[in-house]
């Protein structure tokens, strides 16, 4: 149960945050046209809301850990690192999606399909032990696989992940966040024309 719930909690945070962040600009069109404030405030506010929901979702996970006898060790503190990296990655995705949504209204429908496929390509409901060895390298390129696996190692195994896991988490977070900031900055001055 802990293995499954960990995957569900973390992936739900990803889908909820990106879904809310995608409409951060378009749903605030009237306000953006009337009042000037930095436009990145809108996606950030959505991220904060999703982060609160993540915190609330972690409580049932910890309760299940207690009932299943999963040890509460120092490795749980490493979840802070994992969540911080995931926040950077998710923020980058939100900036990319909110920009795309402003210019292309169909982004919302495309993303619903992409996010569902992404979920099936991430070991949320199944163990990564069933993944063929020749395909495992492609799974390692999936940031959500990295974040969820990192969390599972900390929670279930009660140990620190390998150093390469830290590197993967940081790289995917920084790269996607920087890309999101770049694209958002390039497009934000044109938002008003498309709202």
What are these regions (language model features)?
Residues 2-3, 10-15, 44-45, 74-82, ...:
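Short alpha-helical transmembrane interface motifs in multi-pass membrane proteins
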Residues 9-21, 87-100, 120-129, 180-181:
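Transmembrane alpha-helical segments that form the membrane-embedded catalytic/substrate-channel core
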Residues 120-167:
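Short hydrophobic, aromatic-rich alpha-helical segments embedded in or entering the lipid bilayer
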Residues 39, 45-114, 159-182:
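Alpha-helical transmembrane segments and their short interhelical loops
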Residues 188-195:
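Short cytosolic juxtamembrane segments of multi-pass membrane proteins
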């Amino acid at each position: 149960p802990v293995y499954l719930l960990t995957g569900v909690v973390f992936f739900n945070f990803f889908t909820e945050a990106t879904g809310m962040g995608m409409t951060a600009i378009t749903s605030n069109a009237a306000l953006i046209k009337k009042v000037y404030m930095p436009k990145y405030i809108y996606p950030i506010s959505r991220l904060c809301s999703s982060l609160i929901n993540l915190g609330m979702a972690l409580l049932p996970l910890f309760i299940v850990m207690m009932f299943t006898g999963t040890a509460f060790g120092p490795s749980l503190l490493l979840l802070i690192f994992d969540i911080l990296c995931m926040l950077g990655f998710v923020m980058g995705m939100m900036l990319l999606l909110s920009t795309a949504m402003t210019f292309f209204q169909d982004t919302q429908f495309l993303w619903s399909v992409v996010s569902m496929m992404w979920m099936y390509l991430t070991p949320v409901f199944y163990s990564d032990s069933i993944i063929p060895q020749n395909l495992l390298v492609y799974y390692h390129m999936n940031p959500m696989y990295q974040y969820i696996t990192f969390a599972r190692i900390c929670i279930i195994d009660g140990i620190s992940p390998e150093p390469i896991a830290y590197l993967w988490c940081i790289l995917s977070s920084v790269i996607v966040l920087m890309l999101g900031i770049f694209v958002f900055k390039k497009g934000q001055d044109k938002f008003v024309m498309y709202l």
